[in-house]
From Swiss-Prot:
It holds the Pfam family FUR. Homodimer. GO terms for molecular function: DNA-binding transcription factor activity; transcription cis-regulatory region binding; zinc ion binding. Keywords: Cytoplasm, DNA-binding, Iron, Metal-binding, Repressor, Transcription, Transcription regulation, Zinc. GO terms for cellular component: cytosol. It comes from Shigella flexneri. Fe cation binds at residues 87, 89, 108, 125. The gene is fur. Gene3D superfamilies: 3.30.1490.190, Winged helix-like DNA-binding domain superfamily/Winged helix DNA-binding domain (1.10.10.10). InterPro entries: FUR (IPR002481), Fur_C (IPR043135), WH-like_DNA-bd_sf (IPR036388), WH_DNA-bd_sf (IPR036390). It is found in: Cytoplasm. This is Ferric uptake regulation protein. One of its GO terms (biological process) is negative regulation of DNA-templated transcription.
Amino acid sequence: MTDNNTALKKAGLRVTLPRLKILEVLQEPDNHHVSAEDLYKRLIDMGEEIGLATVYRVLNQFDDAGIVTRHNFEGGKSVFELTQQHHHDHLICLDCGKVIEFSDDSIEARQGEIAAKHGIRLTNHSLYLYGHCAEGDCREDEHAHEGK
């Protein structure tokens, strides 16, 4: 818990119970790409009485402070993940919402080459690749990966 207190203070945020609980949930292995609604449901399951409006407000504060990264994947629903030190890209299944993080040096190099060719010095980029799960029929378990 002390690390979370320090992280909040370092980001310029007061340490409050809702912020600590939301940060705790975001650190769970199954919550790498979670929507505000799914995070709220998880808090309810934990017996926490934190309102949905508070969850949205805290996530926006975390986004502004650089604690989380907001992704707007296909379908219009924002999902959040803890900001990571290493860059990664995403594969997203359009059927079940499953999100796979990956890194590929050759893709990164090629993007840099393309930017240089057009006279652009890259400072940041996002790569989202959309498709359908190749193994099995993920539509049977449509909501298994939502927000993750």
